[in-house]
Amino acid sequence: SPRSIVGVDASVKRLGNYRILREVGRGGMGVVYEALQETLDRRVALKVLPPHAMLDAQFVSRFRIEAQAAARLQHPNIVPVIGLGEDRGIHYYTMRFIEGEGLDRLLDRTRAFLDGDSVPGNGAVTSPLLATELPDRLPGSGVSSGSEPSVVSGVSDAPERAARVDRKTYFRNVARIGLQAADALAYAHAQGVLHRDVKPSNLILDDGGRIWIADFGLCRDETAEGLTQAGDLVGTLHYLAPECFRGVHDVRSDVYGLGLTLYELLTARPARDGSTRAALARQIAEESPPRIRSQTADVPRDLATIVEKATATNPMRRYATADSMAKDLRAFLEGRPISARTPSLGYLLAASVRRHKALAATLITALLAVILLTVLYVHDVK
């Protein structure tokens, strides 16, 4: 049955022309519902301010500014903001409702996959991440805004599929996810918008293999003044970059959150294991995550290098932009050298062989033939 708005009179089951269907998620900046936009007969994700915030004029102002900032983002990998309103003192905005699954929900199956090279038959829908090879490029791929998978995504109704990917394909799928997300973040950053809470639950993978960045409701519009205090800690602690504890947050902090998300997909383990907030904060500020290949030995070296560069404790050692991270992920997928590794002759030759496998095989065959003919010739001469 439809649910009322939390903290508001129980009779409130609609806002404007939206009928509330169910709560699907909540975070520090609001509660998200699945709702029906009755005028257009379509489902949307509707995000409202938490009750305690509706009396705070500054909070409301920030909420509206952030919704407007997110609405400016028009990219195929960002959940679009499609409406902003207020009804009976309740402030809300609406987003496209994405059918898919948050990466946080995939981590348990990812762990089973990496540990046993299979997905347990638990009746859950198998994600494209584990069931098929994702395309390197999607039609109209770009960037877009959104919210937690639990916030704007529904459980896919696609039929259950057995996992068919091998480990090599899985690792490439992780790189493809990272590339889509990095492209999207680069677009948002170019518009002056930071996400500030990049994490697995804010990345939704739909049935077509497209990743959607969700919950720009914690974003900071770089063109807005005075709405976020310099020392505010906005975001989920586990995925906060070390500099955020000093009140510093820039594009490299979003790169860090994406890097940690990819780290977990590659290792099926959290980057840090602090049991308390204080211990976790200390680890984030002082310690680098364990090396990826010490956790999952067969992760391709270049992919591990990219993710480790993105998650460097010192922001000066990270990718300076999401675009530079995207370029390295694209280079990895295309078999080209990545900028994060020192280009030794052996590395460049190996990359060239990976990229031109057919030509390399032909040349090696020809070389072996020449060697064989030379040996036979010398033998005949003797």
For each feature predicted by the language model, list its residue ranges.
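C-terminal lobe helix-coil module of Hanks-type protein kinase domains
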Residues: 19-22, 33-36, 61-71, 79-85, ...
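Conserved N-lobe loop of protein kinases adjacent to the ATP-binding glycine-rich P-loop
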Residues: 36-44
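Conserved beta3-strand ATP-binding lysine motif
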Residues: 47-50
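Regulatory activation segment
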Residues: 211, 224-234
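Alpha-helical transmembrane signal-anchor helices
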Residues: 351-382
